[in-house]
């Protein structure tokens, strides 16, 4: 099993933590990670695009001229698609672009991205992130002490509200829990900052 250094909030190395190789030490499957990232990005699309078809365009209830005898082509409504100002045929309608992948695929993708971060030495383990109250400055000091100055995903245990609130106003900092950390979040982050308790939760969920 791989060992990573365990730091406290002041940036001091206090111990090491053992990581489960079945989760943090596998050969990353780039193809699966790609599929999951595409799926998650698709789910983020709003899909609120819409056009008006002939029934939605205002007006056009009266037949523009009689059926026969004018010499012109027969018409039933000035909102038919062939008219300027008419309805659109087969235009985009509101829809969801999201789709689900099998659970095994999603779990393998998570293991792959966690393993990649550990292999690239971009995984920082911290003993705990505990704050007496939500303080952005205190959280910024923790990141500074740990020499984290790039885009970081902080994974904390469930219920650590003060950590979430403290980091909310910091640029390039995203806070998640083991349950909400997505493959897309992990891929987008330059570094992972994970509490010891969160590591245990990740291993429990993905084991």
Curated annotation (Swiss-Prot):
One GO process term, biological-process aspect: translation
Nucleotide-binding listed as a keyword: no
GO molecular function (one): structural constituent of ribosome
Region: Disordered, residue numbers: 49-78
Keywords assigned: Ribonucleoprotein, Ribosomal protein, RNA-binding, rRNA-binding
Subunit structure: Part of the 50S ribosomal subunit.
Job of this protein: One of the primary rRNA binding proteins, this protein initially binds near the 5'-end of the 23S rRNA. It is important during the early stages of 50S assembly. It makes multiple contacts with different domains of the 23S rRNA in the assembled 50S subunit and ribosome. Forms part of the polypeptide exit tunnel.
HAMAP family in the record: Ribosomal_uL4_B (MF_01328_B)
Family membership noted in the UniProt record: Belongs to the universal ribosomal protein uL4 family.
Stated name of the protein: Large ribosomal subunit protein uL4
Name of the gene: rplD
């Amino acid at each position: 099993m791989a060992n990573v250094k365990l730091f406290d909030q002041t940036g001091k190395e206090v111990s090491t933590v053992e990581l489960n190789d079945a989760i943090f030490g596998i050969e990353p499957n780039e193809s699966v990670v790609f599929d999951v990232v595409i799926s998650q990005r698709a789910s983020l699309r709003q899909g609120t695009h819409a056009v008006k078809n002939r029934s939605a365009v205002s007006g056009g209830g009266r037949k523009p001229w009689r059926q026969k005898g004018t010499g012109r082509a027969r018409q039933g409504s000035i909102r038919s698609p062939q008219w300027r100002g008419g309805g659109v045929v087969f235009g985009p309608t509101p829809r969801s672009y999201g789709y689900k992948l099998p659970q095994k695929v999603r779990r393998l993708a998570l293991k792959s991205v966690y393993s990649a971060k550990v292999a690239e030495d971009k995984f920082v383990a911290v003993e705990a992130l505990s704050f007496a109250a939500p303080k952005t400055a205190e959280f910024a000091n923790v990141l500074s002490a740990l020499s984290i100055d790039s885009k970081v995903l902080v994974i904390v245990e469930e219920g650590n509200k003060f950590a979430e609130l403290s980091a909310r106003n910091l640029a390039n900092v995203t806070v998640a829990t083991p349950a909400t950390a997505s493959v897309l979040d992990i891929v987008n982050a330059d570094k992972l900052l994970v509490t010891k308790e969160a590591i245990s939760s990740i291993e429990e969920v993905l084991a």
